[in-house]
Amino acid sequence: MRLWVDADACPNVIKTILFRAAERLEISCILVANQAISIPPSKWIERRVVSAGFDVADNYIVDNVDIQDLVITADIPLASDVIEKGALAINPRGELYTKENIKQRLGMRDFMEQMRSSGIQTGGPTVFSQQDRMAFANTLDKLLAQRMK
């Protein structure tokens, strides 16, 4: 099992949780970004810097993810591709993407994109909170416990 992180937009507090989990469980945590990002020295934590460009990091993750892996991303199309390959995907707020909910998420994303392109201001996501951090940590622990059996 490996943890794949869509690292460009992942909050630092979530990266820290992932680093601790990788060390504790001795599993690989791979951060993929199109710019250099700092990581702690560890044999369990790696970074992959890909070229800049639309969906380059996402495509790298999809091309390399295996069925037993877990991907952390807020990118709904990436999560959809990961699920198609049979791997798990969660967002930094702890929400598990599933075959059952990903189509609805994609539809809502596309709808909001259409609203924004027509000039309607839709606002952004809510501020990342302590509650979000806790939800992520709880979901991660649950999924890792299931996968490590």
Swiss-Prot record:
Signal peptide: none annotated. InterPro entries: UPF0178. Coiled coil: none annotated. Belongs to the UPF0178 family. This is UPF0178 protein Mmwyl1_2258. It comes from Marinomonas sp. (strain MWYL1).
